[in-house]
Amino acid sequence: MTGRVRAFDERRGLGEVESGGEVYPFHCTRIADGSRSIPVGAAVTFEVAPGPQGRWEAVAISRV
């Protein structure tokens, strides 16, 4: 999938990716390059997977 980083809190390591009107939360450990940081507004590719609470989360996040 493709989308944009809508929000990212570096202190907590939590963010959101928006794609096609849907919003997918993610943790910084899901950023594929291992950097644990990504700027708000960055274009990304990602996959979705069920998270621990059963909602879909962004994983394998890479900048385009």
Tell where the protein language model's regions lie, with residue ranges.
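Hydrophobic beta-strand positions in extracellular immunoglobulin-like domains
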Residues: 5, 44, 48-50
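OB-fold/S1-family single-stranded nucleic acid-binding modules
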Residues: 49-64
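Short aromatic-glycine-enriched beta-strand elements
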Residues: 11-16
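Structural detector for short beta-strands of small beta-barrel domains
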Residues: 1-10
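Short nucleic-acid-contacting surface segments enriched for D/E, G, S/T with interspersed K/R
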Residues: 32-45
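Short strand-coil-strand connectors
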Residues: 18-20
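A short macromolecule-binding patch
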Residues: 22-30
